[in-house]
Amino acid sequence: MTESEQRWLDQGRGLSPEWTWSFTADAPLVGLELARESGDTIVADASGSVYILDRRGRIVTLSRGLHELVDLAWSDSGTHGAVVVGETTLAVLNRQLRLVWTSDLREPIRAIAVDPYGHHFAACLEGGETRILNNTRKTIGRFKTTRRLSHVRFVTGHADLIATADNGLLCRHHLDGTPLWGEPCWSNIGDLTITGDGGAIFLAGLNLGIQRFDGNGNSQGTYVVEGTPNRVSTSYALNRVVASTVERGLIWLDSDGEILWAVETPEEVLTLRCDPLGAGFVCGFEGGRVVRLDWGAPFP
């Protein structure tokens, strides 16, 4: 990123971050993940390329040719990830970006997630069913919800997953599909993020702000920000939250929702991933640029 391209960072309010690194994919962004344990950033673009970047934004592994790539999820350990190819195929990749297996689920896939260790994979389907597969491609759990799910995350330390529909439902299920709770959620939802233990849940609630829930689905209030939040990500332990808005706002908050820094971005944000310690975050723009911003050194 050139000095002129970094200039937008200086237009913010509050304590500005340091630009740590930037990377530009070959095509518009499809997905972005931060492996919280390994520190790798995984990027997928519309040309079918998948990149693994190290902690300094350098390419470690690159794979091309996954045509019709539409979504990406990755384990915290960095060992395995999953992509959606076409509408209905779930494909699992290893750290070398070699294909491990594929499964045609015969329904459009709305959302995917990988557990922190790369052992289990969740796929939320168009018809309202969610399937959980293990690393040998066996379906070990499934459940159906009244509204089709659009965002899903595995909980670290518990064999559970938390998910939400675009509107109307926030829920938690065990790995075998057993429902633990489900709560109505009447705002439109742009994104879902959870702390590592699932004790804090945040929804980018668009016109209703950033909504916070506890691990049992009880409302803990709303973080009010300027604009319409559509992307959100939290640190592993709850100390920082980053959000973006439809109006191209980018906002860095503390655990109580106090705004520490805010800026207008030069283009639309597709994905945000907060550093597990809350030192900073990775921001993926729709056009293909990925930027790492930090307050203090994120690594030695």
Model-derived regions, located:
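Beta-strand-rich domains and repeat architectures in extracellular enzymes and scaffolds
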Residues: 21-48
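Blade-level signature of beta-propeller repeat domains, shared across WD40, Kelch, NHL, RCC1
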Residues: 266-300
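Residue-level detector of Asp-centered blade-edge/turn motifs that repeat once per structural unit
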Residues: 36-38, 76-77, 116-117, 156-158, ...
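Loop/turn residues immediately N-terminal
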Residues: 47-50, 87-90, 127-130, 159, ...
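A short helix->beta-strand "capping" segment at the edge of beta-propeller domains
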Residues: 2-28, 56
